[in-house]
């Protein structure tokens, strides 16, 4: 199938950078900075739809499902990146948020551009991870028409999964297939067609919103503190102590000792201190509160 790139919004030329090859380094990055400043305002009108995606993500996880990101090239890498950040930040299992990139894991490091053109590959990748109706599939494609993503979303729809599409063009094809469309045109790129720039930045901002707000909704934060952070190195152990100190006002020695008693859990340690209860009682309170510290520390 022949594609007319001139009809794709992400392939349009930017009138402000027609002489890009004649600009100084400072002029180039000044123009890039000016263009980047437009991204947040381009996303703003789409916040209600992004919020709907987040509500679906929370619902899916509470029912035992997973969040599946899928995309090709930059879009795929961004999905993999966001998924990879969830376990250390929120203490969730590595298979709760999954990132799929056309061409497999090797494509994260070395581009495999041809793989994005296969509708069947999108379906097969979802079959391989055992996609079921409890999951949500979020397809990402700056152009809004990547066959790999279209194939995955169509298959997910057939199974009865919740689906969402994130693109950077008007009335995207992936948005037509998905339950919720988040089509955020950000205008022509500084370097024509290089969607790793503004389009990629917009996608990253949206993914940040989805994963962060979903995890907060699941009780992974108390106030604005990461209470389920994994302590895999000295920096994170120190952060865990700081989190308990900030949440409760205790000294570092008390925070450290309570975290040890809480078997490494910031969330349990905070509940123990603020509810003045034992480890066992704190665990029970959190279970009853579905992991939300604010509810767990309320007087019974």
Predicted segments with their positions:
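Helix N-cap / loop-to-helix initiation motif
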Residues: 46, 132, 145, 250-251, ...
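Active-site pocket-shaping loop/turn-to-helix segments
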Residues: 41, 48, 111, 232-233
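Short, amphipathic alpha-helical interaction segments embedded in low-complexity terminal/linker regions
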Residues: 214-300
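Cofactor-/ligand-binding subdomain signature composed of acidic, glycine-rich
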Residues: 1-42, 46
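Glycine-rich phosphate-binding loops that contact phosphosugars or nucleotide phosphates
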Residues: 68-206, 212-218
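A short, well-structured juxtamembrane/interface segment
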Residues: 45-60
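Gly-rich Lys/Arg/Thr-decorated short loops/hinges at beta-loop-alpha junctions or inter-strand turns
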Residues: 31-39, 99-110, 263
